[in-house]
């Protein structure tokens, strides 16, 4: 259920990567998707197939969550990023990390749960909660509970890694469940990984 989006779109991603070799727009299961592929060793078709597989799990086991994603997100953005997922509130974009989507040592379930997690941040924003005044740890736990519910809705073997990760994170202290991230260090590590991969 992947189709190329031929409509022109604004260039609104402020972290444009100078190494980008492929920037394309698609629609996957009714969601606009932009793919910014800076890794020549990763096929865009492969990450789109994994994204489609992940959204199909959401559609099959918790279809209301896919409806929420369609309503709450402006787009899913597949891009090289220092973590597996992020919510960009100014742009209404859910980031799903390029190499995370490309992994084949995990099933589509952790990818789907990451999208659900970021989608919950989008829902909180769309509900009008002030992002500067809200309790970050409480919001992270809300997102983790959504992941847990999703994992529990899946067949046991498929959902196990999602359930385990969500349960583990729900036991963390506030500063651990919503840690401050040193984005400069995270980006440095990402760049080092890309250099080692020859990207």
Spans of model-derived segments:
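Active-site recognition of the HExxH zinc-binding catalytic motif
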Residues: 113-126
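Short, flexible/disordered intra-domain loops and linkers
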Residues: 41-45, 130-136
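Short pre-active-site segment immediately N-terminal to the catalytic Zn-binding motif
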Residues: 98-114, 134
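Auxiliary, metal-adjacent structural segments of Zn-dependent hydrolase domains
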Residues: 2-3, 8, 26-93, 153
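Post-HExxH zinc-binding segment in Zn-dependent metallohydrolases
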Residues: 133-168
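Cysteine-nucleophile amide-bond enzymes
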Residues: 2-8, 13-25, 30-35, 181-199
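Short acidic, glycine/Ser/Thr-rich loop/turn "cap" segments at secondary-structure junctions
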Residues: 97-100, 124-132
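Long, well-structured alpha-helical subdomains associated
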Residues: 156-199
């Amino acid at each position: 259920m992947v189709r190329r989006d031929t409509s022109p779109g604004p260039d609104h991603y402020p972290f444009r990567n100078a190494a980008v070799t492929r920037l394309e727009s698609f629609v996957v299961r009714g969601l606009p998707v932009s793919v910014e592929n800076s890794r020549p060793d990763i096929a865009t078709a492969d990450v789109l197939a994994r994204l489609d597989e992940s959204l199909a799990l959401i559609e099959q086991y918790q279809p209301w969550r896919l409806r929420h994603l369609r309503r709450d997100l402006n787009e899913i953005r597949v891009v090289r990023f220092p973590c597996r997922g992020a919510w960009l509130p100014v742009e209404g974009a859910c980031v799903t990390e390029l190499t995370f989507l490309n992994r084949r040592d995990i099933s589509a379930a952790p990818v789907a749960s990451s999208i659900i997690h970021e989608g919950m941040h989008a829902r909180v924003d769309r509900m009008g909660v002030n992002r500067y005044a809200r309790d970050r740890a409480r919001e992270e736990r809300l997102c983790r509970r959504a992941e847990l519910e999703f994992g529990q809705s899946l067949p046991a073997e498929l959902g196990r890694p999602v359930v385990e990760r969500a349960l583990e994170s729900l036991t963390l202290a506030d500063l651990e469940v919503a840690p401050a991230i040193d984005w400069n260090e995270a980006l440095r590590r990402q760049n080092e990984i890309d250099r080692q991969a020859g990207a």
